[in-house]
């Protein structure tokens, strides 16, 4: 878990606009999100969780969660979802967001000084890479 603690700045993004389109995100938010370079900061939360802060040009969001426990989340584009984050290993987290249209699965994996985030909804997958900041 400590591998995630700190700040991460987006440095590479693949298929993100298509992923957001599949989720039903409107054109203007998609365009702003696709050009944004968000920073994600992780801090420890309790004995078995994390606090995740995402800062973009659109807005800043924060979620605190305990691994394995469902929580209410407002996504960066304003959707209300039920999320659960599990710790697969010290260097990998899997988040499942449940919403009206199905489930989005987000896997975050630490690879050296990079965090690779793979998000999948239906048949569309986006990969975003973040550099430790």
Curated annotation (Swiss-Prot):
Pfam families (UniProt xref): Lipocalin
Taxonomic superkingdom: Eukaryota
InterPro entries named among the record's database cross-references: Calycin (IPR012674), Fatty_acid-bd (IPR000463), ILBP (IPR031259), Lipocln_cytosolic_FA-bd_dom (IPR000566)
Keywords, in A-Z order: Lipid-binding, Transport
Gene Ontology molecular function terms on file: lipid binding
Family: Belongs to the calycin superfamily. Fatty-acid binding protein (FABP) family.
Disulfide bonds: none
Keyword Transport: yes
Name of the molecule in the record: Fatty acid-binding protein
Lineage of origin: Eukaryota, Metazoa, Spiralia, Lophotrochozoa, Platyhelminthes
